[in-house]
């Protein structure tokens, strides 16, 4: 999903990461891979049917591209990048820390690296 940033984009970061330590590790690695400060990468969580879900987001041209952390729709993100004339390249591969999320592609842009799930 893609939406514009608003003032309500916030919090619950540590709580989400504490509830899912392994996922928290993945999120931190993802943010580090982006090469941006955590303040510029909004992470927030919410309850959905008693299940805590974490979402990560990447800021691109003042828009937020976000998805469930374990399912990033590659087509949606690629369409977004194309529609906004953002140059990108695609890297395929597996890394041990991310094997549970494979198959996936890495979409590399000047704004950072996006991890996209394949279906």
Where are the regions a protein language model picked out?
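Structural motif
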Residues: 5, 35-36, 81-83
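Active-site rim helix/loop that mediates acceptor-substrate recognition in acyltransferases
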Residues: 22-40
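Acyl-donor-binding surface of acyltransferase catalytic domains
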Residues: 59-119
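Structural motif corresponding to alpha-helix initiation and N-cap regions
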Residues: 7, 28, 74-75
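Conserved beta-hairpin
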Residues: 34-59
